[in-house]
UniProtKB/Swiss-Prot annotation:
UniProt superkingdom: Viruses
GO biological process: symbiont-mediated suppression of host innate immune response; transport of virus in host, cell to cell
Annotated protein name in UniProt: Movement protein P1
Keywords from the named record: Host-virus interaction, Inhibition of host innate immune response by virus, Suppressor of RNA silencing, Transport, Viral immunoevasion, Viral movement protein
Species in which this protein is naturally found: Southern cowpea mosaic virus (SCPMV)
């Protein structure tokens, strides 16, 4: 299964036949024609976040002043290649600094491994950083080794996020609730 980043308007979201995540989340992105805010219902503390196989497409950043002053990568139109989050091979990720400093989150699309239902989910920058084993704030662009391949998850350290991902990968919330209820009964 391959997940891909999505940048969607509210109308585009409404047209998707997917199970939206059950938590509150303000996904901000910028286009040359203006800015749009998409909100999902629920609470951000929802413990169930699926792991991403491969991040494809563009990383969409909220414009902000460059740390070097004036205009910088964080201010360029998000369609610019400088914002690209590309997988050149399964062994190498190339992430722009905006992935870690300017992006509110990725929206990813997948399907449940138990029921096959499609859904959307997201990762905020802290979760992306944790997934990639980057815990130092203020990182700029650099190649990053993947923390998983298409068969196994290779997480660099033990954390609450890692436990969540290992337990609930590829599972929609309805199935998680059913499984949790079955295990507790």
């Amino acid at each position: 299964m391959i997940y891909e980043t999505l940048v969607l308007s509210k109308t585009e979201l409404e047209q998707l036949n997917v199970d939206l995540p059950r938590y509150s989340y303000r996904f901000r992105y910028s286009r040359s024609i203006g800015d749009t805010v998409v909100e999902f219902p629920g609470t951000l503390s929802d413990p169930c976040i699926p792991v991403v196989d491969v991040l494809l497409g563009a990383c969409w950043a909220w414009p902000q002043p460059s740390r070097h002053g004036g205009l910088g990568l964080d201010d360029i139109d998000p369609f610019d290649a400088s914002f690209s989050c590309c997988v050149t091979s399964p062994e190498r990720y190339c992430l722009s600094r905006s992935v870690l400093s300017g992006v509110d989150a990725f929206v990813v699309r997948g399907s449940c491994k138990l029921c096959g239902l499609g859904f959307l989910d997201n990762f905020n920058p802290f979760e992306i950083r944790a997934l990639l084993g980057q815990t130092t704030p203020g990182l700029w662009w650099q190649p990053v080794k993947p923390v998983y391949d298409d068969r196994n998850i290779h997480l660099p350290y033990d954390s609450e996020l890692n436990a969540r991902i290992q337990r609930f990968q590829y599972t929609c919330r309805e199935c998680i609730v059913r499984v949790a209820f079955h295990m507790s009964s």
